[in-house]
């Protein structure tokens, strides 16, 4: 049930029934002395570690179960399928965003962090440290999978993001841009203070559309790139798997998501929220 709005106030002075949080300072060195920052970094590290562990293990398990050389002619009918893999990625994002949103904001993705930084939701210091924690967590999560399933991990490609045969580099890049745009646009919409003010259930349900966006994007782009839309996910697998193809395609999974995130931030803040003046300048508040 939506929150009641004071219509008379709106009609009289055109006042808004919600308050936009003040823009984060571009550089906030004072954050380095606050425990809340380090608590958030730990949350991002652990969440990304768990995300990569569960999802990459799901991919490896699916490939093993559908390997005809191991499981016979009926192997193609086994495993969770592409639908199950997409659910693993989307479901884990839903769970982890729900668990960490109150601590770190539940980014779990450098592209999401970049989009929120461009929208002045986080400072440059916090954004860079978040990205470092996410990448380190991803590497550790994939390393756990390899540690538990060493032979299977190497045999089945390590869950690496690579451009599929038959697709051009431009197609792969476009798929990553569009997929990340969908994700980051959903993040902005689900956490919009205007929506939160008018619908009391939105903050609780915000992780659901974000996870569902990840699920839908995976269905569309798994055949093209294996679905990156998360540079930490792609980097973590590339580091542990250490395959030439994974490294040569790595730039696609950084450039594409960062472009998609930037476009989503500009679209939401400059066009959709222009009347709210939600897009602050890049001048420091100091």
Curated annotation (Swiss-Prot):
Gene3D superfamilies: Glycerol uptake facilitator protein. It is found in: Cell membrane. The keyword DNA-binding does not apply. GO terms for molecular function: water channel activity. SUPFAM superfamilies: Aquaporin-like (SSF81338). Pfam families: MIP. Signal peptide: none annotated. It is a multi-pass membrane protein. InterPro entries: Aquaporin-like, Aquaporin_transptr, MIP, MIP_CS. Expressed in roots. Aquaporins contain two tandem repeats each containing three membrane-spanning domains and a pore-forming loop with the signature motif Asn-Pro-Ala (NPA). This is Aquaporin PIP2-4. It comes from Oryza sativa subsp. japonica (Rice). The gene is PIP2-4.
């Amino acid at each position: 049930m939506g929150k009641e709005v004071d219509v008379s106030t709106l009609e009289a002075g055109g006042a808004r029934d919600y308050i936009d949080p003040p823009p984060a300072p571009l550089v906030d060195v004072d954050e380095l002395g606050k425990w809340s920052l380090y608590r958030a970094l730990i949350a991002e590290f652990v969440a990304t570690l768990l995300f990569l562990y569960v999802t990459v293990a799901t991919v490896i398990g699916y490939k093993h179960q559908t390997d005809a050389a191991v499981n016979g002619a009926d192997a193609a009918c086994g495993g969770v399928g592409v639908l199950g893999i997409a659910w693993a990625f989307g479901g884990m994002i839903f769970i982890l965003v729900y668990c960490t949103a109150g601590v770190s904001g539940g980014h779990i993705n450098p592209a999401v962090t970049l989009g929120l930084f461009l929208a002045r939701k986080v400072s440059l210091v916090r954004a860079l440290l978040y990205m470092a924690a996410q990448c380190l967590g991803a590497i550790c999560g994939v390393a756990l999978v390899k540690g538990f399933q060493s032979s299977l991990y190497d045999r089945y490609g390590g869950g690496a993001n690579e451009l599929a045969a038959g697709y051009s580099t431009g197609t792969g890049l476009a798929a990553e841009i569009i997929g990340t745009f969908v994700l980051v646009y959903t993040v902005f919409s689900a956490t919009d203070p205007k929506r939160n003010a008018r619908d009391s259930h939105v903050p609780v349900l915000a992780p659901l559309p974000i996870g569902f966006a990840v699920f839908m994007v995976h269905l569309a782009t798994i055949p093209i790139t294996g679905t990156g839309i998360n540079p930490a996910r792609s980097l973590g697998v590339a580091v542990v798997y250490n395959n030439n193809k994974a490294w040569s395609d790595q730039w696609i999974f950084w450039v594409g998501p960062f472009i998609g995130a930037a476009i989503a931030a500009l679209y939401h803040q400059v066009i959709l929220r222009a009347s709210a003046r939600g897009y602050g300048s890049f001048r420091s508040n100091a």
